[in-house]
Amino acid sequence: MIKKRIIPCLDVKDGRVVKGIQFKGLRDIGNPVDLAMYYNEAGADELVFLDISKTEEGHSLMLEVIEQTASRLFIPLTVGGGIQSLDDITQLLNHGADKVSLNSSALKNPQLIKQASDKFGRQCICIAIDSYYDPERKAHYCCTTGGKKMTNIKVYDWVQQVEQLGAGELLVTSMGHDGMKQGFDIEHLANIKSLVNIPIIASGGGGNAQHFVELFDQTDVSAGLAASILHDRETTVQSIKEVIRQGGIAVR
């Protein structure tokens, strides 16, 4: 049995870790390198850095953060946010990222997925999906620009397309659940998993350890992403894992 993973997510803006609720109202959490080291020691299986800087200076700071972090980190590091080209991916991997996460750029240019997968290997390419349920159209749609713009691309169509193009992993954020700490969007995640064979990281809604038990018990996703509950020190990676083990689920 493949063991489940717990992955802290750090949203980095202009060199600082921030966190909002449903992608709004950002507050400062701390220094990304320090936090990465804390999670490295605390039993995280991987780390995700999402660069939400708006400026070139912010993106440049991110490269420094990645380099400083990767040199001391013993777990895989995925970096996403603002990646537009193969050159951007090369730069991130050269600075120490193990995987890159593509979102808006892949929606605008799906061939970037194939080109990146061919050049760097499928295992390096994670596709991030900000999924928004539109009650009027009764369907989930992909959003771009940090969840600000809804596209006409349906999530269930997109996940199948990106797998065919060479994505090695999906990072699915249910926007209506993000930062709410009310539990994961189980039904939606299970539906996505039924359509693809690549691993899925679930994001949005993990408010306590029991939510992760439900996630792994009721879906076949590979990993759960956590931000708010870990950054606010409401619980720890090890505490979450202990509860998952007690639920009879294999975890790393």
Curated annotation (Swiss-Prot):
Keywords: Amino-acid biosynthesis, Cytoplasm, Histidine biosynthesis, Lyase
Active-site residues per Swiss-Prot or TrEMBL entry: D11, D130
Main location: cytoplasm
Pfam families given in the database record: His_biosynth (PF00977)
Principal EC category: lyase
EC number: 4.3.2.10
Places the protein is found: Cytoplasm
Entry's Gene Ontology molecular function annotations: imidazoleglycerol-phosphate synthase activity; lyase activity
Top-level lineage group: Bacteria
Assembly, per entry: Heterodimer of HisH and HisF.
HAMAP family per UniProt: HisF (MF_01013)
NCBIfam families: hisF
Family affiliation: Belongs to the HisA/HisF family.
Stated name of the protein: Imidazole glycerol phosphate synthase subunit HisF
Organism: Staphylococcus aureus (strain Newman)
Gene: hisF
